[in-house]
Amino acid sequence: MEDVVLSIRDLHKIYPGGVHAVRGVDFDVHEGESVAIIGSSGSGKSTVLRCINRLIEPTDGVIELRGEQINTPSANVNQVRSRIGMVFQSFELFSHLKVLDNVTLGLRHVRGMSKSEAEEVALDVLERVDMLERIDAYPGNLSGGQKQRVAIARALAMKPEVILFDEPTSALDPELIGSVLQTIRGLADEGMTMVIVTHEINFARDVADRIVYLDQGKVAEEGPSSIINQPKTERLQRFLSSMHEDKIPEGIENELVSTQTDHGYIPDGTGNRPRS
């Protein structure tokens, strides 16, 4: 289809020692779509993302970005990474650089922007993640949630065609998770194309347009976000039962409801939200 941004076909990854982490994964991501990948630890979720962004090389399979295969020897890895943003579990900020400089660095060195051009873009994206007041702070003076929001701003600044989120809240203290989830929800409402690996099941249900459930390196079930409430396979049923449903700590869900009502979206468990 014309609106397919990212296409994954028969993706395999075998690590040294014969560990077959990803076994024939297939899925598409459409323009403006949010796809959540869920599954137990070791199911291959993060490996899939790292293959997409060429941080590791798949053993077999095809990865296409807007119809162009990007996992070939001739593909320019740096160009691929500039088109596909990635936000990691850890924040990967430069500790010796202020917030503003962390965001402008890639714009100046990869995009070739002047300092003033880069700062204009950086200020815009930092405002989008509610970090405009901390532009002169160093990472060491920020909370974990603030660091992650700066990392999201840095990815947004490069104007990627799709952003990959690899467990963006797993390294955060429970009380800091809400602000990061709120930021990602805002991007979804803006129509940003995203693939999100997460253990936050309620968040996936309420924000994602589609869910991809991985089990032992394979797609065991895929469908609209409603499969969280109505799983079709026994494997997904077992997985959801093991997650004890609510992974968002007490108090944070209420915070997210109050902050999102201004956007016309209340996380009600239906998976319904406005689309741009």
Question: In which residue ranges do the predicted regions lie?
Answer:
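ABC family nucleotide-binding domain
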Residues: 4-6, 12-208, 212-222
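Intrinsically disordered, low-complexity serine/threonine-rich segments
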Residues: 50, 261, 273-275
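C-terminal boundary and immediately downstream tail of ABC-type ATPase nucleotide-binding domains
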Residues: 216, 226-268
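Long, low-complexity, intrinsically disordered segments
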Residues: 266-276
